[in-house]
């Protein structure tokens, strides 16, 4: 048996993952906003059922990279890319990709909680209703399952018909996570999910992230290096649109290979 992470998952060699170990594979990805290139020749693999953190200075391209995984950048008229991203056996950067179907497989949670102006219940089942699910028993089971997975069930089980805006910001963010996982995606993208929350809510979300990987592959963008160290199994350091270093989190933070990485994590710049 190899080395174990704090929650007893074997460390993988992320430079040589097998297909069975890989959730997302990025190969020579370049992305442009108009004539400006913002991602440069990025290649790496995201392991299944682990938390992978993307860190780097503001404007380095980490959120842009994250949005490539569910093609959110397609919503920008001047954005184009080349290279390849695979989700399992499917090339998701192909022009024929069904983007709506992709976003059912790759859920996303943003920086600020964005519940819909609906009840707690209707927030959770929103995606299922879009898929045509009407069976009340199926919907009820999905609500309980998702809210339990988001560590919110016991706080709201008697308030499901209340407007979601009556929840605290931390509860709203967990509700948004529940909404994302209700449709049972394979991958969950988290774009600075705690940056707008207080310390107690942040801790709750961090604890949640470490449990979510039992069912999902999690990719996390964070400006908080301490958070990356606490919750992620693997970390990629992005600088000026380039992947500088990618390794298991403990190794990257304690024994970085690249001087740029060391300078960033020790606060010399960024």
Swiss-Prot record:
ATP binds at residues 56-63. It catalyses: phosphate(out) + ATP + H2O = ADP + 2 phosphate(in) + H(+). It is a peripheral membrane protein. Its EC number is 7.3.2.1. It is found in: Cell inner membrane. It is an enzyme of class 7 (translocase). One of its GO terms (cellular component) is plasma membrane. Keywords: ATP-binding, Cell inner membrane, Cell membrane, Membrane, Nucleotide-binding, Phosphate transport, Translocase, Transport. One of its GO terms (molecular function) is ATP binding. Its main location: membrane. InterPro entries: AAA+_ATPase (IPR003593), ABC_transporter-like_ATP-bd (IPR003439), ABC_transporter-like_CS (IPR017871), P-loop_NTPase (IPR027417), PstB-like (IPR005670). Residues 24-265 form the ABC transporter domain. GO terms for biological process: phosphate ion transmembrane transport. Transmembrane segments: none annotated. It comes from the Bacteria. Belongs to the ABC transporter superfamily. Phosphate importer (TC 3.A.1.7) family. Part of the ABC transporter complex PstSACB involved in phosphate import. Responsible for energy coupling to the transport system. The complex is composed of two ATP-binding proteins (PstB), two transmembrane proteins (PstC and PstA) and a solute-binding protein (PstS). PANTHER family: ABC TRANSPORTER I FAMILY MEMBER 17, IRON EXPORT ATP-BINDING PROTEIN FETA-RELATED. This is Phosphate import ATP-binding protein PstB 1. It comes from Yersinia pestis. The gene is pstB1.
């Amino acid at each position: 048996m190899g080395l174990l992470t704090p929650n007893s998952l074997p460390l993988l060699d992320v430079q040589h993952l097998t297909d069975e170990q890989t959730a997302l594979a990025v190969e020579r990805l370049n992305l442009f906003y108009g004539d400006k290139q913002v991602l440069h020749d990025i290649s790496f693999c995201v392991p299944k059922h682990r938390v992978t953190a993307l860190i780097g200075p503001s404007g380095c391209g980490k959120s842009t990279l994250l949005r490539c995984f569910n093609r959110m950048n397609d919503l920008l008229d001047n954005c184009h890319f080349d290279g390849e991203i695979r989700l399992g056996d499917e090339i998701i950067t192909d022009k024929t990709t069904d983007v709506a179907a992709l976003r059912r497989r790759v859920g996303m949670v943003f920086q600020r909680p964005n519940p819909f102006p609906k009840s707690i219940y209707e927030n959770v089942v929103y995606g299922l209703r879009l898929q045509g699910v009407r069976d009340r028993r199926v919907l009820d089971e999905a609500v309980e399952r998702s809210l339990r997975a988001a560590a919110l069930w016991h706080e709201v089980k008697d308030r499901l018909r209340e407007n979601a805006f009556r929840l605290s910001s931390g509860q709203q963010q967990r509700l948004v996570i529940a909404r994302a996982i209700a449709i049972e995606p394979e991958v969950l993208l988290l774009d600075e999910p705690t940056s707008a929350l207080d310390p107690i809510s942040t801790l709750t979300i961090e604890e949640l992230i470490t449990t979510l990987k039992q069912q999902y592959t999690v990719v996390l963008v964070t400006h908080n290096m301490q958070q990356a160290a606490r919750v992620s199994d693997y970390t990629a350091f992005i600088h000026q649109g380039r992947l500088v270093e990618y390794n298991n989190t403990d190794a990257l933070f304690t024994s970085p290979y690249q001087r740029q990485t060391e300078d960033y994590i020790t606060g010399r710049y960024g």
